[in-house]
Amino acid sequence: MEKALLLLSQAMTLGTTGCMFHSIFMENENYVNRSLQRKSGILLAGSLLYLSLPVHVAAIQGQRDWTQIGIWMLLPVLITALIQMTHTDRKVWRWSFGLVAVLVTGVIGRMDGVAGLTVLFLICIAGISRKRWEYPVIGVLGTGLAYPTYLTWKHWIIDGNFAESGLEYVSIMNKGYSIGGLFSTYFHRNGNPGMGILLMSCLIFLLYCTFVKGRKIRTGADTVWLLAVALLTFMSLRYFPWDHVQRMGQWSLGLVSLIQTPTVFFTYAQIVLCVLSVEKIGSIAMTEKTQKELKKAV
């Protein structure tokens, strides 16, 4: 039964991820003019990269963490809803997609409080990069729906009842990644997955196109996202001063202990890099194909 549920969840994740990349590529004119077969190939390749990230594989095979499996399935739904909300001209559809985004954000916050706050941060980054004031509002409303999670946190951290959480005050600084661990092809230390060879290959290819081929790939919005990725990655390292943060007071000691491991932040950095990589590589491939077709026509 569990295996059947696992297969169903991954099939649903494949579908939601395909919808996410379809929404992203709809902003690209070259994608709109492609045949259904080519569109499907691009979407399938991007979805498989998302599903094959080692941190996702670890949640399925090693830990069998249903909370993380659910979050990986819901994140593409959230991204799709946010993008579609800005594209549709009908007010009813805008409100509908906005409501879906709020609900999904709330569900993620109820499933995992740390994930909920990280997603709120990324939604605000999306609002800055796309210049959409609605995004932070949606993020705040969605986080508000998860208020039972954070009321429980308050009871544990502020009211001095941390023992009821079933956790202990711990230092998480030594649980972070080393620099080399970020680039490991699969598992690093303590079972923490690196970014994997597929994502690393995509990033190397984009660096090659930028610095060797001289392509202008990066935009101003991408810079905002890369800064967010850099911050999340730094927070996941064993060099980030989590011990100093914990010394700020009893509340900070409890809050950091609830995080349990800083490697969680690199998970979301990888997701952002995955989405950006698929978008850029797909755009490059479609642009080259269009140029070849134009040359043949001439």
Q: What is each model feature region?
A:
Residues 1-298:
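Membrane-embedded transmembrane-helix bundle of lipid-linked glycan/lipid transferases
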